[in-house]
Each structure stands twice: as structure tokens, then as C-alpha cells.
């Protein structure tokens, strides 16, 4: 599967990027799969806006023949057991999306009361993002709102913490700091606003910019 992505599909993603149809494309591997007999990959299409979207490949004749691409797509399909789609919108952060990403990302999925979405976003962006910027272990951070239609008991947001290596993820989880009174108040407030329902760690397989 990785060879097909590298030798064929990544070249088509690059053509879309050069044409201004997308910012970038990443392929990530889930590190803690619930089904160890299978490998879970995450494909990230970075789109400039909702009006300019490109999940297909457009005209592929300049790169591969129709027969060759059909054969490759059939091979790809024979390896995929299941797939799902998730659309998000970027709400803020300091992840350098136009550059090559770092090696690991930790995704945290948040369920937020529907009446508190604005308050939650402000807490993350105003109160917590500055602390993430000062964290020398973290190479980037982003807040995304999940825009794919979903039930109220499913996640509404995800945060992405970017790290150079797994050791830094462990160090970040192990670190304990004494909190000021204001920091304790902010942390308690965000706990009241959201519930963290899942955490995933992904390792970078390849990226196209």
C-alpha cells in the first residue's frame, strides 16, 4: 500500500498542490491500533478553503495511462478492509501546514456541550495555546472543529499536538508543573466545557507539499 501511494498517488497529489487545489497531503500510521491484525492509515488532505477542494485527481493522462492507473487502483482496493471520512475546519494554532510535518502527532478528540462551542474555542485559543507555544517539546499545535455531520454523543473537536519523536510525547505526558491559581481556574473551566473521549498517536509515513 505504501509503495502504491509513493509511486503513483503521491505524484497526483503533488499535481493538485502545484495547481493550487490543495495545500498538502499527508499519510500517517496509527500507532495504537485496536485491531493489531490490521494497520490503520490516515490520509490528510489539507484544503485552502471549503470552496477549493480536491479529493480526486482530475486529469491523470499526463502521468499514467488509464489502464495502469486502473490496475493500481484495483490493487489498492484489494488491500483496504474499511475506510471512513472525517472533515474538519482549522480554527487556530501554530502548526506549519505548508512545511513538511514532524514525525508524530497526538490527536485528542473532544466532546463539547452544543451550547458551549464558542466558549470552548476561546479557552483553547486564548488561554491554552500560549502555553503550548512555550512548550519546547511540542513542535506545533492546532484546534480543529469536526464538520462531518455526527450525533451529539460523538466528538465535536480535535486537537493536534506535533512532536519530533515518541520520547517527547512520553516526556510531555510525564511533566508535572505547579499551577498558579489562574491556571487552575482555567483548567477547571475547560474540564467543565469538554470531555476528552479518545486519544490517538500517529507516525508520519510520507508528506507531499
Provide a role label for each language-model segment.
Residues 1-209:
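Short S/T/G/P-rich N-terminal loop/turn motif that feeds into the first structured element of a domain
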Amino acid at each position: 500500500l505504501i509503495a502504491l501511494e509513493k509511486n503513483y498517488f503521491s505524484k497526483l497529489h503533488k499535481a493538485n498542490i502545484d495547481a493550487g487545489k490543495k495545500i498538502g497531503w499527508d499519510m500517517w500510521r496509527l500507532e495504537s491500533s485496536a485491531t493489531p491484525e490490521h494497520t490503520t492509515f490516515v490520509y490528510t488532505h489539507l484544503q485552502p478553503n471549503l470552496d477549493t477542494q480536491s479529493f480526486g485527481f482530475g486529469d491523470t493522462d499526463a502521468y499514467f495511462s488509464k489502464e495502469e492507473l486502473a490496475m493500481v487502483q484495483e490493487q489498492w482496493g484489494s488491500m483496504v478492509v474499511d475506510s471512513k471520512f472525517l472533515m474538519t475546519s482549522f480554527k487556530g494554532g501554530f502548526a506549519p501546514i505548508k512545511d513538511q510535518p514532524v514525525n508524530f502527532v497526538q490527536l485528542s478528540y473532544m466532546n463539547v456541550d452544543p451550547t458551549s462551542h464558542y466558549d470552548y474555542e476561546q479557552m483553547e485559543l486564548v488561554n491554552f495555546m500560549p502555553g503550548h507555544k512555550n512548550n519546547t517539546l511540542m513542535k506545533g499545535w492546532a484546534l480543529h472543529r469536526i464538520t462531518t455531520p455526527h450525533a451529539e454523543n460523538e466528538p465535536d473537536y480535535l486537537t493536534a499536538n506535533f512532536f519530533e519523536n515518541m520520547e517527547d510525547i512520553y516526556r510531555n505526558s510525564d511533566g508535572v508543573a505547579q499551577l498558579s491559581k489562574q491556571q487552575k481556574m482555567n483548567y477547571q473551566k475547560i474540564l467543565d466545557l469538554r470531555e476528552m473521549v479518545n486519544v490517538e498517536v500517529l507516525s508520519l509515513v510520507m508528506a507531499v507539499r
